[in-house]
């Protein structure tokens, strides 16, 4: 239905993440999917919102560049940016890396694979990252057409080469796919296991804070970790989608802390 509506409005869109990844699995139904993600052009946001609401979709959340719509129990995440924290080339020109059948777009495999690594880096930084994210990489490496040299060209543009080599080494260690870059990944592997299968659903935020502090050479303190969970600094807050209003306005940090607490407990 969504595809038909977007085509009727002549709005190009790209389906990505779970709805595409599940087709690479031997049994697509085995790849759990909490929502359907589509990318649209920013200038079509208003038209799409009006179109979906007039056709029975409820707009349940507006979160910066992401609008959530629900119909018949299915959640659709409509994005106007592919990944906010890396809104530079190549990700800011995502439509240039897709092939279209009419208005229906699909990313080139190597670009989509690169996006998954960048998306994982975002999860490591803010939410926690589960083993499922590594499994997605393994399945794509096994079944899709991945140009790893091109992947690292894309990662280099957003300064994620080291992270890419780390997660591909973990992928090799866990599932026998990927590459062994002779990196010590024991701490990363433990972190992933502590976060569980899905990461964001079973997220252990204390683990996330501990990892960051150890990476920065700080002595881990449970009390200070709890404070940092409640009151993250400005540079972290401005990267959270629902607190984008603070970007460029550091004097609003007190309001942002309060808003964040209310948002997460509403």
Q: Which positions does each model-derived feature cover?
A:
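Conserved NTP-donor binding/palm subdomain of two-metal-ion nucleotidyltransferases/polymerases, i.e.
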Residues: 1-34, 40-266
């Amino acid at each position: 239905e969504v595809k038909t509506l977007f085509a009727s409005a002549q709005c190009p869109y790209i389906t990505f993440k779970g709805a595409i990844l599940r087709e690479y699995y031997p049994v697509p139904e085995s790849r759990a999917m909490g929502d359907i993600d589509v990318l649209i052009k920013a200038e079509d946001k208003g038209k799409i919102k009006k179109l979906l609401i007039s056709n029975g979709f409820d707009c349940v959340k507006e979160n910066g560049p992401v609008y959530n719509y629900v119909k018949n129990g299915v959640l659709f995440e409509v994005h106007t940016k592919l990944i906010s924290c890396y809104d530079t080339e190549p990700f800011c020109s995502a439509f240039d890396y897709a092939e279209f059948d009419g208005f229906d777009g699909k990313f080139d495999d190597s670009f989509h694979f690169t996006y998954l690594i960048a998306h994982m880096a975002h999860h490591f930084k803010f939410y926690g990252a589960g083993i499922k994210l590594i499994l997605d990489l393994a399945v794509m490496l096994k079944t899709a057409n991945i140009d790893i040299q091109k992947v690292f060209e894309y990662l280099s543009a957003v300064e994620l080469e080291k992270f890419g080599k780390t997660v591909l080494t973990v992928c090799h260690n866990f599932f026998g796919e990927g590459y062994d870059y002779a990196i010590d990944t024991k701490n990363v592997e433990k972190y992933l296991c502590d976060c569980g299968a899905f990461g964001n659903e079973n997220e252990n935020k204390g683990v996330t804070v501990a990892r960051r502090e150890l990476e920065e050479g700080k002595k881990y303190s449970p009390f200070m970790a709890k404070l940092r969970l409640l009151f993250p600094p400005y540079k972290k807050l401005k990267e959270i989608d629902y607190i984008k209003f603070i970007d460029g306005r550091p004097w609003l940090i007190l309001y942002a802390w309060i808003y964040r607490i209310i948002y997460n407990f509403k």
